């Protein structure tokens, strides 16, 4: 049976080495996130200040996988 995961939204606050990011979730928790393979293959740039969707394991809620970068309302792309 596949493990159930929580999906949260958050804000990238800091960029760390090796594709890791510090993320502040909407519920004010700080977690460590890494970029998923699809985002890495698509060369999607993730920078501090971006809003992202993150998938968090039920067993370790301090780490998560970034699965989607949300569009900024004021950007042209």
Swiss-Prot record:
Keywords: Chloroplast, Initiation factor, Plastid, Protein biosynthesis, RNA-binding, rRNA-binding. One of the essential components for the initiation of protein synthesis. Stabilizes the binding of IF-2 and IF-3 on the 30S subunit to which N-formylmethionyl-tRNA(fMet) subsequently binds. Helps modulate mRNA selection, yielding the 30S pre-initiation complex (PIC). Upon addition of the 50S ribosomal subunit IF-1, IF-2 and IF-3 are released leaving the mature 70S translation initiation complex. It comes from the Eukaryota. Component of the 30S ribosomal translation pre-initiation complex which assembles on the 30S ribosome in the order IF-2 and IF-3, IF-1 and N-formylmethionyl-tRNA(fMet); mRNA recruitment can occur at any time during PIC assembly. CDD domains: S1_IF1 (cd04451). PANTHER family: TRANSLATION INITIATION FACTOR IF-1, CHLOROPLASTIC. Belongs to the IF-1 family. Its main location: plastid. HAMAP family: IF_1 (MF_00075). The keyword DNA damage does not apply. It is found in: Plastid, Chloroplast. GO terms for cellular component: chloroplast; cytosol. Residues 1-71 form the S1-like domain. This is Translation initiation factor IF-1, chloroplastic. Gene3D superfamilies: Nucleic acid-binding proteins. One of its GO terms (molecular function) is translation initiation factor activity.
């Amino acid at each position: 049976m596949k493990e159930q995961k929580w999906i949260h939204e958050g804000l990238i606050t800091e960029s760390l080495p090796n594709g890791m990011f510090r993320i502040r979730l909407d519920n004010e928790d700080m977690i460590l996130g890494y970029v998923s393979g699809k985002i890495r293959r698509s060369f999607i740039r993730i920078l501090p200040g971006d809003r992202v969707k993150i998938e968090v394991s039920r067993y370790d809620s301090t780490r998560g996988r970034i699965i989607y970068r949300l569009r900024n309302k004021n950007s042209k792309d």
